[in-house]
């Protein structure tokens, strides 16, 4: 295993980080001791200038690929006195606002007095974000309809211009949530419309923790596996079922855990090995050292030996069963899959199935409702609604990405058919009246309850 240890607090060379741009774009980079990283229109910077700072620090690009730390991407880095002046200027700027946008007349670029040539000239005057801030201030001053906007519209306008002209970026830790955000922006279909909040809900419902043994189906390219490894601190076992020759876990290339630790934690098994492990087991016997020395291609022999041991190891895990949870992010028909999976899950352990379509989970829920092995299968969904805030006021953002998918959650139980539950809903057994004879020979009917009294 590599001696490199991934840091969760400090920017250091040798690890992958997530760079957030003013345009809300995301970029994953691998940091080296030296080198220049380009950020497109936002400029480029020398890697050595950001090493040693805490993760989450924002930087501003200045001349000669140099950077300086700032408070955040959207706020100016000012002294206390300058910050007070800037706050007063912004307050004055936003004080001339309307209650609504009905007085705005859309006449296109004619409403802006600052021409494109003027903006290009300002850009050439320097590479610092101070130039970008100056452009924004001149554009606001030259906007004839700025005072007719509501204060919320004014802030949105200011934010759009900051995203376009400020040369800034933030370096964040690349965790499971951050990696999912990156794939959502890059290729939403790859992660099956999974949202960050839904991923967190899945890990909570499945009780993922260090030292656990989990059975999963991951069709997100390894994003689910990445998030589980991070939450488990690489302590425990993850058995991933796949339907191809090799499991698609390409997202693990950003993990920085090393091949040895990944191999130790994550085991892959195909469906044939999972359903019929006995026929897929490899009978392997190590050759004596004398015969190994005679082999010309020793590397090929070692690869065959390692593969046989890995396959037999994961088959042994499948045969033992008693997994701590089953987690699925897949497009497979779960009604059929669960018939093979449920016997491998331990009692009182969670079953968590994700699908981007609710109708698919309704079919699974209907199938499990009559199955005594799964208790209370329920479907959940979660939504996070962002809000735009200004001092003293707030309102929800009017447009947001939909989707996020749905989760089916149930508890694996071990039914016992020989036990009959008695309790509420069962009527009491009626007492049987038996005849008894008196001393005179007459028959008298007595109640068993009265006799016992």
UniProtKB/Swiss-Prot annotation:
**What subcellular locations does the record give?**
Nucleus
Question: Cellular component GO terms, alphabetically?
Answer: nucleus; tRNA (m1A) methyltransferase complex
GO MF annotation, one: RNA binding
What InterPro entries does the annotation carry?
A: TRM6
Residue ranges for the region (Disordered) are 430-453
Alphabetical GO biological process terms: tRNA methylation
Q: Where is the composition biased (Polar residues)?
A: 435-453
Give the record's keywords alphabetically: Nucleus, RNA-binding, tRNA processing
Q: Which Pfam families would you find in this protein's record?
A: Gcd10p
- Main localization, broad class: nucleus
Q: What does this protein do?
A: Substrate-binding subunit of tRNA (adenine-N(1)-)-methyltransferase, which catalyzes the formation of N(1)-methyladenine at position 58 (m1A58) in initiator methionyl-tRNA.
Family statement: Belongs to the TRM6/GCD10 family.
Q: How does it assemble?
A: Heterotetramer; composed of two copies of TRM6 and two copies of TRM61.
Protein name, UniProt field: tRNA (adenine(58)-N(1))-methyltransferase non-catalytic subunit TRM6
Give the lineage: Eukaryota, Fungi, Dikarya, Ascomycota, Saccharomycotina
Gene name per UniProt: TRM6
């Amino acid at each position: 295993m590599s001696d490199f240890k991934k840091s969760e607090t400090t920017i250091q060379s040798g690890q992958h980080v997530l760079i957030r741009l003013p345009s809300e774009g995301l970029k994953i980079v691998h940091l080296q001791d030296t080198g220049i990283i380009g950020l497109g229109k936002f400029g480029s910077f020398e890697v050595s200038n950001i090493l040693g700072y805490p993760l989450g620090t924002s930087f501003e690009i200045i001349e000669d690929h140099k950077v300086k730390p700032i408070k955040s991407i959207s706020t100016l880095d000012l002294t206390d006195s300058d910050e007070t002046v800037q706050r007063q200027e912004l307050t004055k700027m936003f004080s001339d606002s309307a209650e609504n946008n009905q007085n705005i007349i859309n006449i296109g670029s004619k409403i802006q007095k600052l021409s494109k040539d003027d903006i290009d000239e300002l850009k050439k005057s320097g590479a610092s974000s101070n130039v970008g801030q100056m452009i924004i201030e001149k554009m606001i001053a030259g906007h004839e309809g700025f005072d007719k906007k509501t204060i919320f519209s004014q802030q949105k306008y200011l934010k759009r211009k900051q995203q376009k002209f400020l040369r800034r970026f933030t370096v964040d830790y690349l965790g499971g949530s951050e990696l999912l955000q990156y794939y959502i922006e890059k290729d939403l279909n790859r992660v099956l419309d999974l949202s960050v909040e839904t991923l967190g809900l899945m890990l909570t419902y499945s009780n993922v923790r260090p030292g656990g043994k989990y059975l999963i189906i991951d069709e997100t390219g390894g994003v689910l596996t990445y998030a589980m490894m991070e939450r488990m601190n690489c302590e425990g076992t993850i058995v991933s079922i796949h339907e191809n020759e090799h499991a698609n876990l390409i997202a693990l290339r950003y993990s920085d855990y090393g091949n040895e630790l990944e191999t130790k934690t994550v085991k892959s098994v195909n469906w044939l090995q999972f359903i019929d492990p006995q026929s897929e087991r490899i009978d392997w016997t190590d050759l004596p050292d004398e015969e190994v020395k005679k082999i010309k291609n020793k590397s090929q022999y070692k690869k065959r030996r390692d593969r046989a041991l890995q396959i037999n190891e994961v088959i042994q895990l499948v045969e033992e069963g008693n997994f701590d949870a089953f987690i699925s992010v897949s497009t497979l028909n779960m009604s059929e899959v669960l018939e093979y999976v449920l016997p491998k899950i331990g009692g009182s352990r969670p079953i968590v199935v994700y699908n981007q379509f609710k109708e698919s989970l309704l079919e699974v829920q209907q199938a499990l409702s009559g199955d005594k092995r799964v208790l209370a299968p329920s479907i959940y969904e979660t939504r996070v609604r962002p809000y735009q805030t200004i001092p003293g006021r707030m309102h929800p953002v009017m447009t947001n990405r939909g989707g996020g998918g749905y989760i089916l959650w149930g508890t694996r139980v071990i039914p016992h058919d020989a036990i009959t539950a008695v309790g509420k809903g069962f009527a009491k057994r009626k007492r049987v009246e038996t005849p008894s004879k008196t001393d005179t020979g007459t028959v008298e009917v007595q109640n068993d309850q009265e006799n016992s009294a």
